[in-house]
Amino acid sequence: MVVRSLQDLHRSLAQTPLRAESPGSPAGSAPLKLFIRQPFTESGEAQQRLIEQILQIIDTANDPRCPFNYLTGTRAESADTFRESFERDRRQPFTAKNFRDYRLKLLNQADALINIRVGMSESSAFELSYHIFKGQCSPNLFLVWKHAPIKTTLIRDLDDLCEVTYLEFEHADELREGIRDFFHMLSTRRAAAPIPVIHS
């Protein structure tokens, strides 16, 4: 697996064209829709605490010029909580179909997919495959805990299929700079995108 370094992210930033914005320009102000994938069925209390720390670090990169729309919320879940959370938030029974339909509907809106890997998750591979081959195929950020390395060959080195960044970590705080640079790259790119012309 190719692990992107902070230097790689910095080079990507340097290669992204900048566009001067006029005062009051709406460019970059549209919310960035984030789909944050976390393990559920194989996640215990220790993983839940680690996920919570990572979610807090992600939120420190939330820029009012390109605010985050958390499609999947900001709550760290575990095997003991995610079904109850779904039924409470969605007001419908937890079934495989209901949960799958809901998740794929969110994936279809995602401007970026953040995959927090702190444990084994078959569902993560399913959602990632959908995102690449049928969904938005928008940029992916893998946050890979060193105690839960990616062993599945088919989800390693995905650069030829989509834009993907892999960051490995031991402690959540090690991700701070890489997460900040990833979102800075996305917001800079959005600011540089042409503004669509609306004809009256």
What are these language model-derived features?
Residues 1-200:
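Conserved catalytic or regulatory cores that recognize and/or transform ribose-phosphate-containing ligands
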